[in-house]
Amino acid sequence: MPALLVESLMRVRHPAMVPITDIATRETPLRVALRSWFVVVGFWWSATGAIFALERSAATRTLGLVLASALALWGGALVVLERDRDTPSGARRAFLGAAFLWSWVQVAFYGAWIVGPEARMVPVPAEAPGWGLAVRAVASMLWYQLTMLAVMGWAWRVTTARVNRMAWWTLTLFWLVHQVASVNIFLGVENPGRGFFPEPLAYLESYFGPVRNSWLLPASIAVLLTWTIGAVVQALRGPTPYRRQAMMLLSVIGVLSVAELAILGAPLTVPLWEAFLAIRGY
């Protein structure tokens, strides 16, 4: 991961100093899979943990926003720089750029910088999930939802008709699985993860559904699992090294998404970010 970050930074600041080379003949399915797993899981675990830890105080939230904004600018530059490079490394760097942009949105949300209309950021009385409650839930974090769509729209615009659309695919998949998880929590799951929201966002727990799994959870897992298997097949049989690398990265996101939904449906605690939560004082 550090080597990938350093090379990506060199490409942004001094593109002429970094030769455009991809030794496709040395790529094997196992190597592509391991590299993809390392990049996606490493970023997912460390970025999520950092977001939790930075909610410790107003000062750390501000620091988190500054750092995330700087990385988002770098991420945007990577998306633009790599959009004409249909190589495995181009796919990885475009993924990294999209991940930085997505992380900026999440940091802004969890730091309560971009959430929704202030009048809506209050707990609501308990009631069964329904359309009215769903509309209020979306309205309570409207700016956050619109910001995600705006970032996706920008990625779509700058990668349209380009050979490397990995950033757009990544952001779209992030958004889709995020919405699927949110709707499942709204309808009800065994393990919604109460207590993870920082104090300014604690009101969102009033929109959590009953502590039981709804019909949507197994259906969501089945659909995501089917898509992930298809993505793995494309990653193994893709016509080009770029396509194989891109689909392998997306398939790892799919695997993590299936695992996340399974954890939501299981009455257990998985200590993935205990150290980060301890820093926050959770």
Which residues does each PLM region occupy?
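Central hydrophobic cores of alpha-helical transmembrane segments in multi-pass inner-membrane proteins
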Residues: 44-48, 68-82
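Short, hydrophobic transmembrane alpha-helix segments
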Residues: 49-62, 80-85
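Transmembrane alpha-helix boundary signature
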Residues: 83, 107-121
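Interfacial segments of alpha-helical transmembrane regions
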Residues: 91-95, 160-174, 243-255
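Short aromatic-rich membrane-water interface segments that cap or initiate transmembrane helices
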Residues: 126-141, 202-215
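Hydrophobic, aromatic-enriched interface-forming segments
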Residues: 138-196
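Membrane-interfacial catalytic/cofactor-binding modules of polytopic membrane enzymes
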Residues: 189-221
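C-terminal transmembrane-bundle signature of multipass membrane proteins
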Residues: 210-282
